[in-house]
A protein has these predicted regions:
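N-terminal loops that bind phosphate or other acidic moieties
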Residues: 1-130
Length: 130
């Protein structure tokens, strides 16, 4: 069991992050310790500042898993510029529903080092050509 539950921050274009959180809640029930930041209306520096502010709103000892939609988009770039001293912030791009379900289902029982590769694998496995 994880001694300190990791928290989730989704940084996405438009309302994608909010809709993903709503969809997770419809499947697993409401999830605590999750927030979103949209890039809408922000400059590059403004988006980075908004992300930093959100990270600081979480408990100081909680590891933050920062999900972005596109690695090369404004959200991915801003997350790479993030500098929050004294915080554990792990970043993963290409957020999708299978990845988030894996995170919320296992964040209380697996360490971050176990959980992150599992989330990546589940996210990739969720992409199937039929």
């Amino acid at each position: 069991m994880n001694p300190i539950r990791p928290v989730a921050l989704l940084v996405t274009h438009g309302v994608l992050g909010e809709e993903l959180v709503r969809t997770v809640a419809a499947i697993l029930g409401p999830q605590p310790d999750v927030a979103t930041v949209s890039n809408s209306g922000f400059s590059a520096d403004g988006l980075t500042n908004a992300i930093e502010q959100r990270v600081r709103e979480f408990p100081a000892d909680a590891p933050v898993v920062l999900f972005t939609d596109l690695a090369a988009g404004s959200c991915g770039i801003a997350s790479r510029r993030l500098g929050v001293e004294g915080r554990i912030v792990r970043k993963i791009t290409g957020v999708n529903l299978p990845m988030l379900l894996e995170f919320f289902h296992y964040r209380d029982t697996l360490s971050l080092d176990e959980l992150l590769p599992r989330m990546e694998a589940k996210g990739k496995a969720g992409i199937v050509i039929l």
